[in-house]
A protein has these predicted regions:
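Extended catalytic cores of very large enzyme megasubunits
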Residues: 1-749
Length: 749
């Protein structure tokens, strides 16, 4: 398997002067590639040949290793293969001499200033990275160590301990060894202090009460991705829809221009109409007429959370759509598909309002045929708002049959990758839109929140220092995540959500950049133990219960771009590729486009990307390799990071790239079925997915035209003047979860 650990006793000096541990698997891959190029069948001696190459090495230079490969091929009598390997080396050297190397900060700086940097009031310009880190750090100090100003007099030992923990941990954020919740980077400060929902990337809750719908709007407006369930057992708890009183007077409701005001309009005016006397829900209700006069015009600046006001039209459209759905169901309960469409209308309001791109996942009962075919057989075209949520059937391990699983997979292959699937141990388990967090045992009428931090594996050094560095990063990530778990003030939500967060706090310490540094796979169990121990210690210090689930692997789309590493457990797309990022109205985007007009094409900014020579790319792994990595991460990171007594566990959220033909896809499906206990939610994508797009989000550089475009983007690049930006439009122009990989994409046949 290409993910085996490097051999630390031999250090290899790369062409850029850096050193990495010798990894025999890379030798095996190069030998097999030479056999393929020569059109010869692969042989059993390949491992023996790799051993001889390892024994041949003395200086540890890359060129010497390649010489040893040539000699080994010749010694074993494979002269044709050796010739192909020599040609391959020559072409690689020639191509390398012609390549331009992009500025390593080009994309990461753009991501930071576009999504996380806020307006620094003192200077009147956007924050630097250090200022953003300080903003989030100081928020935690205000919450947990308010007496820290008196520490010099020795009056507050508890505050001193907490302050030291916070200061030390955020130095690791400053050096980008770890990341806190990416929502805290965007909203840290007043925006989170008045609404703790903004701390968390995602949440999950069953739709078992009408209030869950208005709360979902509130959560999406707060920046949370929303996972929800319309399983029979949950939707069956909803009351029958009341009938409109024929001659009742019209009730007027003026909508406040806050996220609470928007969500209250949905709750009071549509979902749970009440009598004028406030006596509670009735069997019939009055018509509510909305007044939108207090809502700021589109384009106004939002001061607390940042961003631009969307105006009232999207809200009005949503309220009318949801009202129509309720009217069509008078005298009966809503069906799961109707609840799902209501939720999609709510999310569409958030998107159409220009506030942010919503992220949602809908879990449904596997026996619900309307939900199974929600995006199939033309149903998607008739209900375009269903694009707002990914749909996944809940498959209970031990109950679902292989034939039904195959049916779901077959339907997904014909319907743009949906429905997806989520394997659970009981129907009460749920997940967030990206699928890395497991929820179970939620209190009635409550939401569970994803509390995420991240370890940058690419920043872990090679060699003997790697283990201690990785464990230290795990400790810092656990400290920060435990501090985040104490933010449990959720205005507008049912009090039970706060009670749930206090009684059963969750933590999700994730890993990213594994493809940059597979050496960390040796230390996962030790790292998980550090996460558990640190969480228990810090939780006791701040008065929280220890988390039962502490480790996960999230997709890490945006966070990995900020760090300049591979995303989560995924390999890089290719050695060199062009990334297209959609143009938005944020000032950072406009600054980049102004400095680099030739990099803007068809509504996207084009970024040239080049990955380290020794990093793993998609072509290095087949589908089974990727699944085996997921299994290893579950076995050595997820399970060891789960305490006894937990009724669920977190997950490795991954998109598996699959090569079409030769039964490869079917072998991948077989592997998933045969290892159910290791898998919860996966997405599949064809290896050649970029061929499905005229302008793919990620485009491999493989033709002369692409080579010319890549080099042009590198040579003409000019650093934008981000610090001169004097407005705060940034944080509202982001996805409602931190992924890019949440979407289940087309499954190859």
């Amino acid at each position: 398997m290409p993910w085996s650990s490097p051999r630390p006793h031999i250090m290899i000096t790369k062409r850029d002067g850096s050193t990495v541990a010798f990894n025999r698997d890379k030798i095996v891959k190069s030998i097999l590639a030479a056999f393929n190029a020569a059109g010869e069948a692969q042989i059993s001696e390949v491992d023996t040949m790799a051993e001889s190459v390892e024994a041949c090495c003395s200086s540890g230079a890359v060129s010497e290793i390649q010489d040893c490969v040539e000699r080994s091929l010749m010694d074993y009598g494979y002269t044709n293969v050796a010739r192909e390997y020599i040609i391959y080396r020559h072409k690689r050297d020639e191509a390398r001499s012609l390549r331009e190397r992009p500025d390593s900060t080009m994309l990461s700086d753009y991501i930071f200033y576009n999504k996380y940097s806020r307006l620094d009031v003192a200077s009147g310009h956007r924050e630097t990275w250090d200022q953003t880190v300080d903003r989030v750090r100081d928020m935690h100090i205000r919450k947990y160590a308010p007496s820290s100003l008196a520490l010099a007099e020795g009056k507050a030992p508890r505050s001193l301990a907490i302050t030291n923990l916070i200061m030390e941990s955020f130095e690791a954020v400053r050096s980008r060894r770890v990341l806190p919740s990416m929502r805290s980077m965007q909203f840290g400060g007043k925006a989170i202090e008045v609404n703790n929902c903004r701390m968390y990337n995602c949440c999950y809750g069953p739709i078992d009460h009408p209030d869950r719908m208005s709360e979902a709007l509130y959560l999406l407006l707060s920046g949370c991705g929303v996972g929800y369930s319309v399983q029979w057992d949950h939707v069956g708890c909803l009351p029958e829809v009341s009938a409109l009183v024929p001659a009742a007077p019209v009730v007027h409701h003026t909508i406040e221009d806050t996220i609470e005001g928007w969500a209250s309009a949905l709750r009071v005016g549509v979902l749970v109409p009440r009598s004028p006397a406030g006596s509670g829900p009735r069997s019939s209700y009055e018509y509510v007429e909305f007044n939108y006069s207090l809502i700021r015009p589109a384009g106004s600046v939002l001061r607390t959370s940042g961003g631009i006001a969307p105006g009232h039209l999207a809200l009005k459209k949503m309220l009318e759509s949801v009202r129509a759905a309720f009217c069509s169901a008078e005298g009966r309960q809503l069906r799961p598909i109707e609840v799902h469409d209501i939720m999609c209308s709510i999310a569409d309001c958030v998107v159409s309002g220009g506030i942010r791109r919503s992220a949602m996942i809908c879990l449904f009962s596997s026996s619900d045929s309307e939900m199974v075919y929600a995006k199939a057989h033309g149903n998607y075209e008739g209900h375009p708002s269903r694009a707002m949520a990914n749909n996944s059937a809940v498959l209970v391990r031990g109950e679902v049959s292989r034939s039904f699983f195959d049916r779901i997979i077959a339907l997904a292959s014909e319907s743009y990758g949906e429905p997806g699937f989520v394997f659970v141990s009981s129907k009460d388990e749920g997940t967030n839109p990206c699928g890395e967090i497991g929820f179970s045992g939620l209190r009635p009428e409550s939401w569970g929140f994803c509390n995420l931090t991240e370890v940058n594996c690419a920043a872990v050094p090679s060699g003997s220092a790697g283990r201690s560095s990785f464990l230290e990063a795990c400790r810092y990530a656990s400290v920060i995540g435990t501090l985040q778990a104490g933010y449990t003030r959720f205005p507008f939500l049912s009090p039970r959500s706060g009670e749930q967060a206090l009684a059963a706090p969750l933590l999700g310490v994730s890993l990213t950049g594994i493809a940059d540094n597979p050496q960390v796979l040796q230390h996962l169990r030790d790292g998980a133990a550090v996460v558990l121990e640190t969480n228990a210690r810090v939780a006791k210090l701040i008065g929280l219960a220890p988390a039962l689930q502490t480790t996960c692997v999230k997709p890490s789309g945006t966070a990995s771009l900020l760090l300049g590493c591979a995303a989560g457990s995924h390999p890089y797309h290719a050695r060199r590729y062009i990334r297209r990022v959609r143009v938005d109205a944020d000032a950072a985007c406009l600054a980049y486009a102004e400095a680099n007009p030739s990099a803007v094409s068809d509504g996207c900014i084009l970024f040239p990307c080049m990955v380290p020579d020794d990093a793993t790319i998609r072509a290095d792994l087949n589908g089974i390799d990727q699944l085996e990595l997921v299994q290893a991460l579950v076995r050595d990171w997820i399970i060891p990071g789960t305490r006894a007594g937990a009724t669920s566990q977190h997950n490795v959220s991954a998109t598996i790239s699959v090569t079409s033909g030769n039964g490869t896809y079917h072998s991948v499906v077989d592997h998933v079925w045969n290892g159910l206990r290791f898998f919860k939610a996966l997405a599949f994508a064809p290896m050649d997915i970029e061929n499905n797009y005229a302008s793919p989000p990620l485009e491999t550089v493989s033709t002369p035209a692409q080579e010319a475009l890549f080099n042009s983007l590198v040579l003409t690049y000019k650093a934008p003047r981000y610090l001169s930006i004097d407005n705060d439009s940034s944080p509202m122009n982001h996805a409602a979860c931190d992924s890019e990989r949440c979407s289940v994409v087309h499954v190859p046949k």
